[in-house]
Amino acid sequence: MIRHAFISLLLFAAPAAAADGPSRTFEARDLFSLEAAADTQISPDGSRIAYVRRSGDIMTDRMRPSIWLIDTASGEQAPLVAGPGAHMSPRWSPDGSRLAYISTAEGGAAQLYVRWLESGESVRITGLPTAPSSIAWSPDGRQLAYVMLVPGEAPRLGRAPSRPEGAQWADPLQQISAVMYRADGEGFIRPGFRHLFIVPADGGAPRRLTFGEFHHDGPIDWSADGRNVYLSANRSPDWEREPDNSEIYAVDVASAALRPLTDRRGPDAAPTVSPDGRRIAYLGYDDRGYAYTQTRLYVMDRDGSNRRALTGGFDREVSSPAWAADGNSVYVSFDEGGVTKVARVGLDGSVRTVADGLGGADLDRPYSGGSFSVARDGTLAVTAGSASRPAEVAVVRGGSRRTLTRLNEDILAHKTLGEVRRIETRSSHDQRPIEAWLTLPPGHRDGQRHPLILEIHGGPWAAYGPNFATDNQLYAAAGYAVLSVNPRGSTSYGQEFADLIHRAYPGNDYDDLISAVDAAIAAGVADPERLFVTGGSGGGVLSSWIIGRTNRFRAAAVQKPVINMVSQVLTADATPYFARYWFGAMPWEDHEAYWRRSPLSLAGNIRTPALVIVGAEDNRTPPSEAEQLYTALHLRGVPTALIRVPGASHNLVGRPSQNAARVSAILDWFQRYRNGWQPPQR
């Protein structure tokens, strides 16, 4: 029996076009034309916004980042750095006369540049062997601090004989000794450690300020007098096996002396200095041994004393702290019910929402996210998103939002997009409220049923929201309704909801997902005889788990899954994290727990035709996971196919052509098995 407490359908997108309006639907080629705003940085006086504009390029098959400048009064914008290469991380000087940024304009490693706004001249001020990150201006505008990998020597056991001159020998042996030796999107990690540097803002020799065989990370900030730089680092003796144990450090600019300001078990990061220099706001949490703990906002005196939580009573994760000019409050972003917002947190712990509806950089799926910055007068620059548009640039003053860009009107204004509606139901497991969104085929009429794709988010500690998603729009254009669910464990609903899957994933989230499917059927939208399922990463785990639990779905597309928790923990790039926090025991200590949570344990039940997709260079959910499912299905005699995406990391969607082909393959697979499949009689 299907049980529902209530179903609410609320419209988040524009209504369906009138008969004389645009009739074209979203199509794969449009992926090359989309643009999105990111990293909005408002000038100190609030008059201009620099932002990163990500634009599709059909000739290079990539999203190219460039930097644009907007006048906040007129809305006029112009490219600041938009030539060949990737241009990112614009940061204003304290007086607003210059803009530092990172660019690969000259090829090779990314370098640090400074743009003088009055003259329009840009100067490269570094010639670094590896890319800088986390750039921060000194208070007087004379120096820039940044973090950079300092290459180290690879370990060596033995050596080959001397090579004769002119001989062509094989590459030397590659010896590995690090616990974490691969990183997704990077491959085998280059030997070395990230360290803090400063460099004159008009060019000169960089000076290194941190040392030792530890990584030192941003975001970073300067003390008000310019004598110290604050950063975070995990310098514990067993830092390789204790990934969540970083502290805030003060680095003396003159002597390079390092002084810890925090000393608890847990990750403290993102130090942000108050305007008067007396306090430091930062992010962190007490390590509970859980796979997910909401990050809180803290404040302490500049010497590390009087540490206290400001959001201890606020049951949401916060990020991106930025002080208000009066020093009496701190701005942060947070997610609530899949929607990203900005709040102002007082030193008394009060929390007041000042902006909502932010949009993130993800285009393929409707993840929550977004960025903001704040001017001295409290004006906010945000990336504003919606169900019908990728992120734009907007300003928020006095609670009123004004969108300054229309990056995709040339494409999307002439498209009929699928409407996005909210559904709320209750889980059949324990009657907890479960929130979801339905993307409907263009031209949908009430009472009309459609084949349904259950599309499951990754993480699993993440959240979907009413956000633009190319995957969903392509599915909808093909005639499918798409269901995006936030099952238990999803973020933005509080710590207790997230904890429901601690060492219990996958598990009762299955009931949440199926209850949402039943709600879509009860709403008169989904055809109960034409159900399909897909998802990536954590969604790949759950889509493979679902077809091991039920035969209700005609076909599945399992993307970048984890199938065998033992092999995942021992081959993924975050090995110390998975074993320590997801299980609390090594595979040889509690093999039953690993197997009980492995979708492979249910492979003998699967009768659903399943397409399996994975990036060939995925180091987070390695290809061997997808291959195990593919092989198991073949051995079972269940229809299957394996797609490896060449050059793709866990991200999978870095190249628009591959992204379009991936969605097309999923739609072809679903069409092939639209009537289901029955095993042959033996």
Model-derived features with residue positions:
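Active-site-proximal cap/loop segments of hydrolase catalytic domains
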Residues: 484-682
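Multi-bladed beta-propeller domains
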Residues: 18-37, 59-63, 69-88, 103, ...
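Residue-level detector of Asp-centered blade-edge/turn motifs that repeat once per structural unit
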Residues: 44-45, 94-95, 139-140, 224-225, ...
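Cap/lid segment of the alpha/beta-hydrolase catalytic domain
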Residues: 236-237, 288, 407-529, 536, ...
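Short glycine/acidic-enriched loop and turn motifs that connect beta-strands
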Residues: 55-59, 105-108, 151-154, 236-239, ...
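Predominantly five- to eight-bladed beta-propeller fold
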Residues: 64-65, 149-199, 232-235, 242-247, ...
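Hydrophobic beta-strand positions that form the internal "hydrophobic ladder"
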Residues: 49, 96-100, 141-145, 229, ...
